[in-house]
Amino acid sequence: MELMFQDTNEIYNISESIFNKVFNEPLVHQIIVCYLARRRQGSKAQKSRSEVSGSGKKPWRQKGTGRARSGSLRSPIWRSGGVTFAAKPKKYKLKMNKKMYRYAIKSILSELIRQNRFFLFKEFIIEFPKTKILLKKLELINLKSVLIITAHKNTSLLYASRNLYHVCVINVKSINPVILISYEKVLITLSAIKKIEVMFK
């Protein structure tokens, strides 16, 4: 399968076993749900009426005072009382098969290529870590919402993109299904695509 470099107009042969898969939408959805669920901290905790501090004694007698009846200082309707349905720490982790995860990544990458949202560059570098320089470079190739994938951590690109909410720079090892579908277009370097071919072969 052939893909053209955007900076040199040369042709590069990419692996069909990775970049020419049928788009499996139900699988991609399932993997994204699992991925987001695994990122949840699940540490929220509240105290119920049985856990908050306070006396168990009835504040006043049931009848004769003219006041509303009450049985406990720890009642949820009282100030400093417990929470009615107190949240407890919970594990949201869902099972995710490695084979399914890898296929979902391949499926997304293949669909990005089919939709002409995948741009290959021999190299994509900027001289100084300046947002202005990066913006100008992206404007020249008409890219606004873009995910830039490099083979290694690129400090200049990383610093230049930090203040741009529509631009994200990651290295190959940080690829995941959520980030791949979060941007309109994907820009990838030759060294990064070679690493992907090794990782997902």
Curated annotation (Swiss-Prot):
Q: Name one Pfam family in it.
A: Ribosomal_L4
RNA-binding among the record's keywords? yes
GO CC, any one term: ribonucleoprotein complex
Q: Which GO terms describe its molecular function?
A: rRNA binding; structural constituent of ribosome
GO BP, sorted A to Z: translation
| Keywords assigned | Ribonucleoprotein, Ribosomal protein, RNA-binding, rRNA-binding
- Which stretches of sequence are listed as region Disordered? 45-75
Q: What does this protein do?
A: One of the primary rRNA binding proteins, this protein initially binds near the 5'-end of the 23S rRNA. It is important during the early stages of 50S assembly. It makes multiple contacts with different domains of the 23S rRNA in the assembled 50S subunit and ribosome. Forms part of the polypeptide exit tunnel.
Could you say which protein family the record assigns here? Answer: Belongs to the universal ribosomal protein uL4 family.
Subunit-level organization: Part of the 50S ribosomal subunit.
Q: What is this protein called?
A: Large ribosomal subunit protein uL4
Organism of derivation: Buchnera aphidicola subsp. Cinara cedri (strain Cc)
- The gene that this protein is the product of is rplD
